[in-house]
């Protein structure tokens, strides 16, 4: 009986590996440069990150770093211990050409062999990334693990049911509503300091109205600052 259980467990792990490989092989794309996201990131840093007064040598992770706009902003502010995390080869190339330190990791699992021990990180920046996780509760559990007690995380995600239908983006797996997001943060040991729903208009040059004018869409983002309130008792 024990042999049968061991075989079933092994098969489950093999399936999990295959499912992950399918997701991340089929649906990874380079974010590339975007003036809109570059500008929005600069605004986010000024509004939410600067007031935290993080030490200049704080261990900071930019999870799902894209082409490195957050890293650029923090480097301008003379932060010295910055690491970007992404699986995108194109974004890795852009970031490394700028001189940023980049790790090619899944956004949900940071290897201890590379120094990501329990309570080893001072701040996590997670802008437009959590929606790319197939299992956001696992992602948040991992962020809890590596963050020091009392440290902060910034999370920004698209809200559900927006004009641009983020749910249908090929690698958007988790478009969470406000209550679900708040509940997951609470379950994974975080205390929400600031939760804002931001609405704004966006024009996409490649999408036009019948008269040829650029069509505008209403976007809505959830912007959250949270504190690691307690470690998780996972054994």
Q: Where are the regions that the model predicts?
A:
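Conserved N-terminal segment of class I S-adenosyl-L-methionine
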Residues: 1-117, 123, 140, 219-222, ...
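A short SAM/SAH-binding and catalytic strip from SAM-dependent methyltransferases
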Residues: 123-134
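A short glycine-rich, Lys/Arg-flanked "PGG" loop and its adjoining helix->strand segment in the class I
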Residues: 137-149
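Conserved beta-strand signature within the Rossmann-like core of class I S-adenosyl-L-methionine
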Residues: 151-157
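Short "lid" loop at the C-terminus of a central beta-strand within the Rossmann-like core
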Residues: 158-163, 175, 199-200
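Acceptor-substrate binding/catalytic loop of class I
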Residues: 165-180
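Conserved S-adenosyl-L-methionine
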Residues: 190-201
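Core SAM-dependent methyltransferase catalytic element
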Residues: 205-235
